[in-house]
Amino acid sequence: MSSGTENDQFYSFDESDSSSIELYESHNTSEFTIHGLVFPKLISVTSQDSEFDINEDEDGVDTIYEGMLDAPLTKNNKRILCEGSVPNLSYECLTTKGIFERMLQRVDHLQPIFAIPSADILILLQHYDWNEERLLEVWTEKMDELLVELGLSTTANIKKDNDYNSHFREVEFKNDFTCIICCDKKDTETFALECGHEYCINCYRHYIKDKLHEGNIITCMDCSLALKNEDIDKVMGHPSSSKLMDSSIKSFVQKHNRNYKWCPFADCKSIVHLRDTSSLPEYTRLHYSPFVKCNSFHRFCFNCGFEVHSPADCKITTAWVKKARKESEILNWVLSHTKECPKCSVNIEKNGGCNHMVCSSCKYEFCWICEGPWAPHGKNFFQCTMYKNNEDNKSKNPQDANKTLKKYTFYYRLFNEHEVSAKLDWNLGQTLGTKVHALQERIGISWIDGQFLSESLKVLNEGRTVLKWSFAVAYYSDASHNLTKIFVDNQMLLANAVESLSELLQIKTPEVIMKRRPEFYNKAGYVENRTTALMECGRELLCKGICKAAE
């Protein structure tokens, strides 16, 4: 395999070998080619119901928004990289308010049939897991029994000889009231339902507060009569029933989890609704992943619920995450943040995304990932991404636990390094962006001219994400196969490109950053091209069964 410059790469493999692919780049610096398909240097793919849009800015440079090309490559009269194609996903993003409106639509649909308050219908639907057919069947057979069972029938619970019927479901003040819960006799506010079971307001509040966390129907403390949302708010003195609404919404989404998925990102309450799920089996069969984007611009896989994980499919991703969760949190932190200088053994803590390290003590330059000298990394390939089998291991049982552990530790370290580096790059990029923005305002640079930094940062982040998950693919792949070796070569090329772009973020002077704007665009374009190539090569590994997780 030969190598060249960023804009002049050529890799060719025997077309008769069914395990190989051809991958080459055009000498035209404005485009690159995979399997005969020509792509512009910077491809922008955005997804609105999975429709791809290519956007070009005023300088003729494509802008990067949120995704890499994830579609099959084809070529006339040539072997297809991986047979088959998948239909576009049609989805919409909703808030909890939008979900609740859909729940109320179901209630309104049943209102003419049931002829009971909407709040009661909502309770019935939740009790039957939103199975309308089952609810209608039971309602037809034993309507009265069902209402009594769920505490929705007041007539069955009313105490005939009580004095509270004219004031039920209201907070009242009473003198010398004795509460049978706390056994206190005092002047206090009280509350009771039609059943006449009356208690002091403090006891009722404690009771409701405990029940709200359970998310179930709240009934009277002495019978099955149910409290409605307005009752809860009256007793608590503020809108507390919203917690029950949250529980109802969660129940609705859980029941319809084939079509509705919560965004898995922390503190995000967005929900994605996939209108048609019939295409999901085809995505799985062809080793594509149905990636979607929520209202907060978080991209995740609708199928497995993890972050965007190309080139790994959902099965590889799930297996990798399950294995990674067994690791010690302390070990993860040590691997992520600290290492000894290979030359003088001084402890070094990483505070940036770039993997080119310079020891402050002895000035030794080394690679954070492989701990080797940095000089060789500037040429040819990023060799530290290649797992090397020791010769001694060849004579051992391939199932040897020690060998497997070493292999996993190697790839897990790489996975973890790029995950941490992505976060550090992003934080550093945001800081630089603030400085560049201030410079724009000070010297009058247009908004468009300053977009190169955020665009490059998005490309870098996506490149690191794809590179990160490529190590999971490499771990589960047959290392002896020719296509796996090609995949590793593509990893090296992307790793080189990512590190080269990341180094530009180390520039601290805004004026220098602006002068090097063309370099940001060129390197970002190369990162994106290499990212796309690695994704497609990884998918072929999966399609051909060269990469597969153990059952």
From Swiss-Prot:
Xref: PROSITE patterns: TRIAD, ZF_RING_1, ZF_RING_2
Q: What is its EC number?
A: 2.3.2.31
Paired cysteines (S-S)? none
SUPFAM superfamilies linked: RING/U-box
Q: Where are the zinc fingers (RING-type)?
A: 179-225, 341-370
Q: Which domain of life is it from?
A: Eukaryota
Q: What class of enzyme is it?
A: transferase
Provide one Gene Ontology biological process annotation.
Answer: histone catabolic process
* Entry binding sites for Zn(2+) 2: C301, C304, H309, C314
- Binding-site list for Zn(2+) 3: C341, C344, C359, C362
- The answer on whether this UniProt entry bears the keyword Cytoplasm reads no
**Which controlled-vocabulary keywords does the entry list?**
Metal-binding, Repeat, Transferase, Ubl conjugation pathway, Zinc, Zinc-finger
**Residue numbers annotated as active site:** C354
IBR-type zinc finger span: 242-314
Which residues take part in binding Zn(2+) 4?
C367, C370, H377, C384
MF term (GO), any: zinc ion binding
Q: Does the keyword DNA repair apply?
A: no
Quick one: which residues bind Zn(2+) 1?
A: C179, C182, C200, C203
Named in its record, the pathway it takes part in is: Protein modification; protein ubiquitination
Q: What does this protein do?
A: Probable ubiquitin-protein ligase involved in the degradation-related ubiquitination of histones. Contributes to the post-translational regulation of histone protein levels by polyubiquitination of excess histones for subsequent degradation.
Subunit structure as annotated in this protein's UniProt entry: Interacts with the E2 ubiquitin-conjugating enzyme UBC4 and histones H3 and H4.
Family label: Belongs to the RBR family.
Q: What else is known?
A: Present with 2250 molecules/cell in log phase SD medium.
Q: What is the protein name given in its UniProt record? A: E3 ubiquitin-protein ligase HEL1
Q: Give me the gene this protein comes from.
A: HEL1
